[in-house]
From Swiss-Prot:
Residues annotated to bind hyperforin: 244, 282-285
GO MF annotations in UniProt: DNA-binding transcription activator activity, RNA polymerase II-specific; nuclear receptor activity; nuclear receptor binding; RNA polymerase II transcription regulatory region sequence-specific DNA binding; zinc ion binding
DNA-binding region ranges: 35-104
Short sequence motif named Bipartite nuclear localization signal, residue ranges: 63-89
Keyword DNA damage part of the UniProt annotation: no
GO biological process, one term: negative regulation of DNA-templated transcription
Oligomeric form and interacting partners: Heterodimer with RXRA. Interacts with NCOA1. Interacts (via domain NR LBD) with CRY1 and CRY2 in a ligand-dependent manner.
Function: Nuclear receptor that binds and is activated by a variety of endogenous and xenobiotic compounds. Transcription factor that activates the transcription of multiple genes involved in the metabolism and secretion of potentially harmful xenobiotics, endogenous compounds and drugs. Response to specific ligands is species-specific, due to differences in the ligand-binding domain. Binds to a response element in the promoters of the CYP3A4 and ABCB1/MDR1 genes.
Cited PROSITE patterns: NR_LBD, NUCLEAR_REC_DBD_1, NUCLEAR_REC_DBD_2
Name the record gives this protein: Nuclear receptor subfamily 1 group I member 2
Highest classification ranks of the organism: Eukaryota, Metazoa, Chordata, Craniata, Vertebrata
Organism: Mus musculus
Residue stretches making up the NR LBD domain: 143-430
Keywords for this protein: Activator, DNA-binding, Metal-binding, Nucleus, Receptor, Transcription, Transcription regulation, Zinc, Zinc-finger
Length: 431
């Protein structure tokens, strides 16, 4: 046997072993329920290849032998070796002879260019299948499109993202490191030390800084005192009350623009706003949150928690920061944010709601619109769980809302800071 013939035979065997490792034969049943067998080696066949029912191994062998166009000789010099699944690797010449005798045709082998074309077509179809919307995702109905447009218009009219109209607000005094709180604040805290002690059980030192950029380009900074005893929140309370009230007014106006909300009885409107205003504000604040710096960019104002694992409320800050980071990672569209606000607003289980069934139907309508929007605008299946994630986020937001309200009421009892609107929103809606 010439060296090149032996070398070619070894190459064909190695390629076949690689094919066998990559792809197992597929069982093909005959009409009577039996298994189809390879007409060359008797192994289980997986379909017609080059005009003959064969296994995957013989298909690959025949294609490689024809493309290489090598002369194969029977090492046993008989030329009539029996080809079976166990012996097919022993004599490549007789195996090729059996392929041709079985009817396999060289002209049916695809060229390399045709193979590449076919692979590209398969990849394209696979990609199109992945990016195609899920079953039932046929796009938004006209009613859903109108619903989203109404919410987007309401958001644009009532959400001052640059805080350009936020001008009348109080600022904390500028403290230096180690400076004590003003005497009037110390006196107010000493009036009811038991109450403040109760508040401090749920508090850890706060590390929040505030930066204000003036219209003339000047910059005013507030840094919390280095001494952290939990009371450094007090100087910021009036300012935080003002910025919260400004956001609350925007959210209330957002609700009033929505026709479905205006159609509800005034009592239900009040109950829904009392329950959802804080949640809707958090959703709006999230659009201005930078996860890398932990900063909220609110126009000329910038709020930064320097120590997110410490500061503010032990029961409030950690869940709130985690919530903002979790929500921001979803990379939501503006349409998804406004639909979340609507779902939060139209919650039928808010205290004091009378027309629960009506509100429940409205909430379901907004939820279905959100689901349809995701299905027709997000790649599938990469975002197939986004709707469920958003609904879980809204559930978590309800929990944060309850914790926040309790903390604010407790601080308010010890050191009144809330604006009239805040007091109205956080007042009891029972009965």
């Amino acid at each position: 046997m010439r060296p090149e013939e032996s070398w070619s035979r070894v190459g064909l065997v190695q390629c076949e072993e690689a094919d066998s490792a990559l792809e197992e034969p597929i069982n093909v049943e005959e009409e009577d329920g039996g298994l189809q067998i390879c007409r060359v080696c008797g192994d289980k066949a997986n379909g017609y290849h080059f005009n003959v029912m064969t296994c995957e191994g013989c298909k690959g062998f025949f294609r490689r032998a024809m493309k290489r166009n090598v002369r194969l000789r029977c090492p046993f010099r008989k030329g009539t070796c029996e080809i079976t699944r166990k012996t097919r690797r022993q004599c490549q010449a007789c195996r090729l002879r059996k392929c041709l005798e079985s009817g396999m045709k060289k002209e049916m082998i695809m060229s390399d260019a045709a193979v590449e074309q076919r692979r590209a077509l398969i990849k394209r179809k696979k990609r199109e299948k992945i990016e195609a919307p899920p079953p039932g995702g046929q796009g938004l109905t006209e009613e859903q499109q109108a619903l989203i447009q109404e919410l987007m218009d309401a958001q644009m009219q009532t959400f001052d993202t640059t805080f350009s109209h936020f001008k009348d607000f109080r600022l904390p005094a500028v403290f230096h490191s180690g400076c004590e709180l003003p005497e009037f604040l110390q006196a107010s805290l000493l009036e009811d030390p038991a109450t403040w002690s109760q508040i401090m059980k749920d508090r850890v030192p706060m590390k929040i800084s505030l930066q204000l950029r003036g219209e003339d380009g000047s910059i005013w900074n507030y840094q919390p005192p280095s001494k952290s005893d939990g009371k450094e929140i007090i100087p910021l309370l009036p300012h935080l009350a003002d910025v919260s009230t400004y956001m609350f007014k925007g959210v209330i106006n957002f609700a009033k623009v929505i026709s479905y909300f205006r159609d509800l009885p005034i009592e239900d409107q009040i109950s829904l706003l009392k329950g959802a205003t804080f949640e809707m504000c958090i959703l709006r604040f999230n659009t201005m949150f930078d996860t890398e710096t932990g900063t909220w960019e609110c126009g000329r104002l910038a709020y930064c928690f320097e120590d997110p694992n410490g500061g503010f409320q032990k029961l409030l800050l950690d869940p709130l920061m985690k919530f903002h980071c979790m929500l921001k990672k979803l990379q939501l569209h503006k349409e998804e944010y406004v639909l979340m606000q609507a779902i939060s607003l139209f919650s039928p289980d808010r205290p004091g709601v009378v027309q629960r069934s009506v509100v429940d139907q409205l909430q379901e309508r907004f939820a279905l619109t959100l689901k349809a929007y995701i299905e027709c605008s997000r790649p599938y299946p990469a975002h197939r769980f986004l709707f469920l994630k958003i609904m879980a986020v809204l559930t978590e937001l309800r929990s944060i809302n309850a914790q926040q309200t309790q903390q604010l009421l407790r601080i308010q009892d010890s050191h009144p800071f809330a604006t009239p609107l805040m007091q109205e929103l956080f007042s009891s809606t029972d009965g």
